Amino acid sequence: MPTFIEMDRTVTLADQLKDEGQSVVLINTFVVPPAEAEALLAAWTADAEIMKRQPGFVSTQLHRGIAGSGTFLNYAVWDSVAAFRAAFTNPEFQARLADYPASATASPHLFRTVAVPGICAA
C-alpha cells in the first residue's frame, strides 16, 4: 500500500472530498525506486480498470518521469467531486491499494481549471 503524502499541507484531500462542485481534475504523483516502477505500473493499471468503470469517470492519462525516473503523474478527469469520492471510497478500489509496492508514495489532489485571458480557458 502506498504511503499517502498531502500535496498541499493546508488543504487535504479529505477537505477536498467535502466539496460538492462539478468537474474536477485529479493530479496524483507516485514515487517509487526506479527498480519498482514496473510493479507500480501493474498496480496502477489494475486500479485504472476499476476507476474507468465508475460513474462520472471521464478520462485518465499516466505520465512517467524521463531518464529512468521512478516518478509517475496521473491526470484524471471526473464529472464531479461526488463521483470521484464514490470511486475513491469504493471497497474494490480500496482493496487494490495493497497491491502497490510498500515503498510507493502517492500524493493525490483535486484541481479545477483556471481561465487566464489570452493563454488558456477554464
Model-assigned labels for residue ranges:
Residues 1-24, 61-71, 96-122:
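Glycine-rich beta-strand-turn "strand-cap" elements at beta-sheet edges
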Residues 13-15, 20-43:
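N-terminal first-folded block
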Residues 23-31, 61-90:
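Short, well-ordered beta-strand segments in beta-rich or mixed alpha/beta enzyme
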Residues 29, 48, 109-113:
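General detector of folded, globular domains
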Residues 36-59, 92-96:
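Short amphipathic alpha-helical segments
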Residues 78-95, 114-122:
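A broadly tuned preference for mixed-charge, low-complexity surface segments
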